[in-house]
Amino acid sequence: MAARVGVLSVAGFRAAARAGGLLRASKQSSAVSHVPCRTAIATSAGTVLPKPEKVSFGLLRVFTVVIPFLYIGTLISKNFAALLEEHDIFVPEDDDDDD
């Protein structure tokens, strides 16, 4: 079944190529080139826009990003350690001191 689909798709591609649908040369002139305008950094006239003002959030950024994700990471690791201990995969022992 898969081989038949491959044969049919190749035959369809060849028929479209013969009809000029896929391999036809472009009718656009290569002498006219379109220059893209990057509106984020330049105006339509080509001048560079001034650098935008940077707004610093400082401690607000620390409190809203770092601290909640540290707390979530702590909860995940605590729950995973409890799961390992519950299934006797890793049980910490105090008898490891062989000094």
From Swiss-Prot:
Organelle transit peptide residues = 1-39
One GO term under biological process is: mitochondrial calcium ion homeostasis
Membrane topology designation: Single-pass membrane protein
| Keyword terms of this UniProt record | Calcium, Calcium transport, Ion transport, Membrane, Mitochondrion, Mitochondrion inner membrane, Transit peptide, Transmembrane, Transmembrane helix, Transport
GO MF term set: channel activator activity; protein-macromolecule adaptor activity
Mitochondrial intermembrane topological domain ranges are 78-99
Q: In terms of one coarse class, where is the protein primarily found?
A: mitochondrion
Q: Which Pfam families does this UniProt record tie to the protein?
A: DDDD
Q: Name one GO cellular component term.
A: uniplex complex
TM helices/strands, residue ranges: 58-77
| Compartments where located | Mitochondrion inner membrane
Q: Which residues lie on this side of the membrane: Mitochondrial matrix?
A: 40-57
Quaternary structure annotation from Swiss-Prot or TrEMBL:
Component of the uniplex complex.
What does this chain do? Essential regulatory subunit of the mitochondrial calcium uniporter complex (uniplex), a complex that mediates calcium uptake into mitochondria. Required to bridge the calcium-sensing proteins micu1 with the calcium-conducting subunit mcu. Acts by mediating activation of mcu and retention of micu1 to the mcu pore, in order to ensure tight regulation of the uniplex complex and appropriate responses to intracellular calcium signaling.
Of which family is this protein a member?
Belongs to the SMDT1/EMRE family.
Q: What is this protein called?
A: Essential MCU regulator, mitochondrial
Species this protein is from: Xenopus tropicalis
